[in-house]
């Protein structure tokens, strides 16, 4: 394969911070701490140089939140490295008919914020296209040119390793006519971030400083107002997103000159709010969402999900072959019923995540025990990870009985009796009022004749003795059966005579009997009865003491299509009857009656994995000796061996739902139309590419930045064009403005569960007292791993005994007033991280004490300290 070059991660994440200079690097593994670095973006490493160090502080010396940079690098793909390898300065590269040494990397990034000029966010409206009458944000501004001013557009920036290592997305750019908001309150916006390259040529993208403000502040107090969790006219924030492109610079010894090679396709960067709980993942991460989409929309794992009958030889379809994918999606698709997930790799992490929410909110702490990892709880990984055990010696003995009974005809007759019993019962019931009772369908005489006929056929087919090896017997049987066409026809004729002899039944019953017997005979001839007998042997000799525990947890899950169902009903004899479905989190729309989706659910792929596990179809890799996982640190062993590992490691730290509108980015991410392939956004090349092609740059020898980097042939669009691709700002524009409003309110939601299809009911309109008395609501969490409710916090420095359970946002209520407070309070909030002096093992009774708290809030910026700093 020709060498290709790609940017990874495909989607990078930068995070806001109000520290003017201090920053770190976003984690590149799931549930990890940020990577510590120096002022030039070079990671700090262990003395042996093998491991990057993580931060010990999330804030600078003055208590201001550090920004987190998204880091990008180039990976090379060729025959030696089909899964990619990191490319380094000094490596040999090829492209454009040239070959040489990599001496530099030019990076081009274009950030923008389109929130204020986009549509109002109204829950799920717009996910499948916007109604022509859907309201716009800042709808009072109607002129197209005027609305263009609602887009924050600093233009593209470029950096490289040799001559221009930093760039800034500021309003004062001589080479590009930028668009920034007018003066705002409480905070104006004059930058969307910065670029820099480290000493190895990798790119770091830093986002904004968390500034949000409105130009509408002429109320009686001279202050802006927030009236909604998602849509607030006049407001802007400095979140952003956009494409990341790279060009390789080589020195070609053949021509003794510099030549240029573009990477295959752009990556994307999202600049979002801080990660306050970096070591606890969401129940569904963005990686889970994209993985599910990759499997069900892009045919990426046809060994797991594909056309019926193809799992032994999975289809292979390129992710960019749209006609083939459309044809595949229209087929008979299903999940592979025989696939065995690994417990610690695939199952335990799904169960582990919600259990960690106990340390982020009061709600679970009061109601969820002993639903935890203690030996008394239902989340005991040693029990849940114990697969069914099969007594293979007993199975072998049972298989021998199957073989002998198959050869003698006993199995044929016994299974036929069981198959005819429902029909015989039905016929007997219909004839119960008749004067003469009907004879049995399969009399002993008839059964004996059938047994003899089948046994005779078996002796002729495979000999007098069936042997003792089950697989060998089955193979010989199938081979003989396929070649004995004349003998099979003779047997079928003989069976016809036996079944039809002396029949005292009406013609319709006799015909039905004949059909059933011949269907059964076909199972016998094909070997199906023998295979079924083996399955029964295995099932009978399988010991699964923890199967009921697995099934109980699975039965609690909210299946696809049950997003509006609160409790499990209709199963009064079940242990789960009357219990709430899980996960008990808010869905994509628990607020309005337009496209309601009250509660959250797992992805289809996660649900499938847990279904296999519940049925006992899984491996425990620890028991098998394949791995030695740490159940209490399920991601500790994550290593980015491939570029896909890096893609997944980064994006796993982004919220994967619910999307109302969501965390960093929203429901647009599950739309396959915005993806070139899984983990790579389809980009509008007019806004992602360098102004000149690599060939033009090679012909010119060198091209200054200003000659091509800042050229713009058209404005950033105020509409979508998924065929062409996404432009800068097209991912974050769906999110709330300012981001602090939705972030503050996504703590809990009161969901009306009275009726499945209605989020809002109005008993007062009809004076319906019965409806009012029967009305039920449930206070439901949104996503505590992003926005905690309560946390453990050490209130006295250096005194672990002072650890106390406190509200995470004291003085900031879940109201519009609280939303406005959050605009200036967000950076003061504490960060929840693993407790260095604690233990992750809960106490035997399930309620952790101070010394057993696994997560603790740190670095809360106290107001009194800030005042002292300002005075000094």
Language model features with spans:
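Aromatic- and Gly/Pro-enriched helix-to-coil junctions and flexible linker segments
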Residues: 1-463, 467, 473-474, 480-872
């Amino acid at each position: 394969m020709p060498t290709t070059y790609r940017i990874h991660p495909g989607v990078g994440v930068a995070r806001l911070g109000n520290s003017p200079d201090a920053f770190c690097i976003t984690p590149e593994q799931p549930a990890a701490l940020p990577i510590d670095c120096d002022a030039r973006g070079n990671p700090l490493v262990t003395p042996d140089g093998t491991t990057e160090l993580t931060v010990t502080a999330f804030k600078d010396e003055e208590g201001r939140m550090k920004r987190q940079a998204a880091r990008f690098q180039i990976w090379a793909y060729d025959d030696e490295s089909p899964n990619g390898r990191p490319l380094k300065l000094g490596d040999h590269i090829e492209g454009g008919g040239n070959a040489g040494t990599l001496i530099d990397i030019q990076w081009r990034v274009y950030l923008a914020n389109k929130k204020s000029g986009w549509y109002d966010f109204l829950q799920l409206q717009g996910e499948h296209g916007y109604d022509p009458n859907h309201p716009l944000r800042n709808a009072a501004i109607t002129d197209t040119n005027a609305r263009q001013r609602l887009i924050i557009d600093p233009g593209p920036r470029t950096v490289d390793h040799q001559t221009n290592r930093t760039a800034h997305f500021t309003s004062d750019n001589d080479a590009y006519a930028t668009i920034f908001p007018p003066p705002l309150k409480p905070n104006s916006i004059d930058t969307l971030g910065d670029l820099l390259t480290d000493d190895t040529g990798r790119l770091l993208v830093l986002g904004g400083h968390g500034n949000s403000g409105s130009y509408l502040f002429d109320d009686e107090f001279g202050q802006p107002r927030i009236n909604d969790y998602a849509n607030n006219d006049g407001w802007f924030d400095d979140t952003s997103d956009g494409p990341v492109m790279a060009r390789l610079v080589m020195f070609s010894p053949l021509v003794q000159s510099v030549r240029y090679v573009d990477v295959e396709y752009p990556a994307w960067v999202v600049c979002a709010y801080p990660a306050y709980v970096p070591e606890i993942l969401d129940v569904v991460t963005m990686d889970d969402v994209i993985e599910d989409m990759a499997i069900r929309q892009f045919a990426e794992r046809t060994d797991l999900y594909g056309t019926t009958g193809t799992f032994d030889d999975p289809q292979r379809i390129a992710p960019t072959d749209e006609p083939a994918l459309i044809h595949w999606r229209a087929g008979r698709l299903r999940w592979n019923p025989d696939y065995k997930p690994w417990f610690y790799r695939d199952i335990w992490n799904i169960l582990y995540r919600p259990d960690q929410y106990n340390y982020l909110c009061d709600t679970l702490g009061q109601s969820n025990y002993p639903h935890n990892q203690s030996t008394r709880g239902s989340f005991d990984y040693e029990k849940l990870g114990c697969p069914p055990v099969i007594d293979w010696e007993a199975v072998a003995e049972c298989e021998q009985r199957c073989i002998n009974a198959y050869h003698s005809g006993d199995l044929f007759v016994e299974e036929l009796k069981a198959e005819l019993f429902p029909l015989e019962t039905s016929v007997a019931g219909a004839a119960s009022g008749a004067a003469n009772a009907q004879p049995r369908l399969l009399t002993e005489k008839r059964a004996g004749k059938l047994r003899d006929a089948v046994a005779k056929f078996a002796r002729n087919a495979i000999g007098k003795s069936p042997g003792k090896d089950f697989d060998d017997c089955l193979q010989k049987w199938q081979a003989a059966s396929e070649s004995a066409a004349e003998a099979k026809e003779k047997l079928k004729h003989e069976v016809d005579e036996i079944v039809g002899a002396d029949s005292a039944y009406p013609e319709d019953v006799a015909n039905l009997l004949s059909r059933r017997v011949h269907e059964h005979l076909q199972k016998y001839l094909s070997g199906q009865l023998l295979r079924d007998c083996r399955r029964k042997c295995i099932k009978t000799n399988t010991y699964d003491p923890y199967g009921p525990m697995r099934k109980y947890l699975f039965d609690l899950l909210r299946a696809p299509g049950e997003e509006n169902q609160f409790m499990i009903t209709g199963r009064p004899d079940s242990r789960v009857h009357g219990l709430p479905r899980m996960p008990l989190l808010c869905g994509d729309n628990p607020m309005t009656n337009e496209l309601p989706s009250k509660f959250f659910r797992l992805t289809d792929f996660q649900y499938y994995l847990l279904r296999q596990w519940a049925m006992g179809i899984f491996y425990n890799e620890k028991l098998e000796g394949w791995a030695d996982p740490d159940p209490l640190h399920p991601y500790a062993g994550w290593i980015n061996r491939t570029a896909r590992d890096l893609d997944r490691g980064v994006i796993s730290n982004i919220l994967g739902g619910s999307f109302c509108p969501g965390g960093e980015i929203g429901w647009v991410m599950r739309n396959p139309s915005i993806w070139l392939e899984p983990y790579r956004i389809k980009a509008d090349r007019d806004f992602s590419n360098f102004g000149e092609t690599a060939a033009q740059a090679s012909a010119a020898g060198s091209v200054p930045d200003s000659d091509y980097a800042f050229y713009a042939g058209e404005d950033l669009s105020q509409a979508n064009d998924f065929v062409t691709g996404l432009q800068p700002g097209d991912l974050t524009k769906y999110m709330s403005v300012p981001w602090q409003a939705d972030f503050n309110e996504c703590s809990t939601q009161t969901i009306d569960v009275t009726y499945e299809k209605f989020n809002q009911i109005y008993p007062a309109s009809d004076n319906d007292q019965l409806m009012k008395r029967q009305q039920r609501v449930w206070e439901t969490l949104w996503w505590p791993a992003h926005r905690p409710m309560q946390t453990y916090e050490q209130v006295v420095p250096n005194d672990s005994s002072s650890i106390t359970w406190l509200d995470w946002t004291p003085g900031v209520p879940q109201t519009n007033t609280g939303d406005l407070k959050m605009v200036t309070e967000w950076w003061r909030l504490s960060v929840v991280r693993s407790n260095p002096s604690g233990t992750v093992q809960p106490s035997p009774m399930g309620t952790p004490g101070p010394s057993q708290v696994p997560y603790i809030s740190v670095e809360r910026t106290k107001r009194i300290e800030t005042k002292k700093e300002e005075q000094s």
